Curated annotation (Swiss-Prot):
Domain of life, source organism: Bacteria
Source species: Francisella tularensis subsp. tularensis (strain SCHU S4 / Schu 4)
Stated name of the protein: Nucleoid-associated protein FTT_0810c
Composition-biased stretches (Basic and acidic residues): 17-27
Function comment: Binds to DNA and alters its conformation. May be involved in regulation of gene expression, nucleoid organization and DNA protection.
Summary of subunit composition and partner proteins: Homodimer.
One function term, GO molecular function aspect: DNA binding
GO CC terms of this entry: bacterial nucleoid; cytosol
Length: 112
């Protein structure tokens, strides 16, 4: 079995480019988290920056604690969506396979 260092380096570079692209896509994405059947919505970027919060006028007469809970739930919903989309777009095994690298299953990487 011949070991081709230049081929390995090309594969590693391709994988690095794919990971960089996935990171850029994540940073540019926006998700919307909601609570109270859509009465509270939070728009968040892939960098976890909250861009906007929308509260339906019908909630303005609600108790302060209820409103705080709904806002927290909407933020948590948005965070969960960012994480779900990040995991899907940066699957290390898929990137490695696309780069022609066969990784053994069961490796626990310190990142996603």
């Amino acid at each position: 079995m011949n070991f081709d260092m230049s081929k390995l380096m090309q594969q590693a570079q391709k994988m690095q480019e794919q990971m960089k692209k996935a990171q850029q896509e994540r940073e540019n994405m926006e998700v919307i988290g909601e609570s109270g059947a859509g009465l509270v919505t939070v728009t968040m970027t892939g960098k976890y920056d909250v861009k906007s919060v929308s509260i339906d006028n019908s909630l303005m007469s609600e108790d302060k604690e209820i409103l705080e809970d709904l806002i927290a739930a909407a933020v948590n919903s948005a965070v969960k969506k960012v994480e779900e989309n990040s995991t899907a777009s940066s699957d290390i095994y898929k990137m490695a396979k696309d780069a022609g690298i066969d990784l053994p299953s069961g490796i626990n990487f310190p990142f996603k």
